Design a protein with these regions (language model features):
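Acidic, divalent-metal-coordinating active-site segment for phosphoryl/phosphodiester hydrolysis
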Residues: 214
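Intrinsically disordered, low-complexity regions enriched in acidic/Ser/Thr/Pro/Gln residues
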Residues: 2-172, 176-178
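Glycine- and Gly-Pro-enriched alpha-helical subdomains that act as flexible
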Residues: 156-211
Length: 214
């Protein structure tokens, strides 16, 4: 398990606009770390992330990418102190095919990393729209309750102002889980992975996030 912290304290020079002298003060800084994901011995992707809830992040990423359908396909997931996540997946995915598919769309991208795809792919303009298959509705009060929770409980953001936050909530707005990260995509993956690992159903839940949806 990584022993990195999500926040570091650094001395900064605080420059004021009221004409008073600048001063050196302690400030809380959000940490960004690299996490190299190795699938069945193959280096697949390096994620830039806040170093907490890393297992949830990796599981959510694999689910979002369609590499796995459920957490039960993972026979091992281990975060090392060298910022690697070693994952054993069954059945073994065709990683080379995925890497070649990404390379063919944009040779400059980092292999396997959807967060560095071309602008058209990033915006979703090349994807067919998905139609809702559920008739579940949520009252406005539930949405407001979830947003209030984000504003209140996003502790890293409140200390640093440098991260996004996402929560998954039930029909009445009660938060099931909450995640923070320097990357807005990562917060969603952490939520998906965390809920999936706990066996929570997504059928009657909604997601609230501080990041823009694109």
């Amino acid at each position: 398990m990584s022993d990195m912290k999500a926040i570091k304290n650094r001395k900064i020079l605080k420059v004021k606009t009221d004409g008073t002298p600048a001063e050196t003060v302690d400030d809380a800084i959000a940490v960004e770390s690299q996490l190299s994901v190795v699938l069945n011995g193959t280096s697949y992707v390096t994620l830039l992330c806040t170093p907490e809830k890393l297992e949830d992040l990796v599981v959510g990423y694999l689910l979002s990418e369609g590499i796995i359908d459920k957490p039960g396909q993972l026979s091992r997931i281990q975060i090392t102190r060298t910022h690697r996540c070693e994952v054993d997946v069954t059945p073994e995915p065709d990683l080379q095919k995925r890497i070649e598919a990404v390379d063919s769309r944009n040779p400059a991208v980092f292999k396997g990393n959807r967060r560095m795809l071309s602008p058209s792919a990033e915006s979703g303009s090349d994807l067919a729209p998905l139609m809702a298959s559920s008739d579940v509705t949520f009252p406005l009060s539930a949405l407001q309750r979830a947003i209030d929770t984000l504003n209140r409980d996003a502790s890293i953001y409140r200390k640093t102002g440098g991260v996004h936050a996402t929560c998954i909530a039930s029909k009445d707005g009660e938060t099931v889980c909450l995640a923070e990260d320097v990357g807005r995509y990562n917060t969603v993956d952490k939520e998906i992975g965390g809920c999936a690992r706990r066996g929570s159903s997504f059928q009657d839940k909604f997601l609230a996030t501080t990041g823009r949806i694109t």
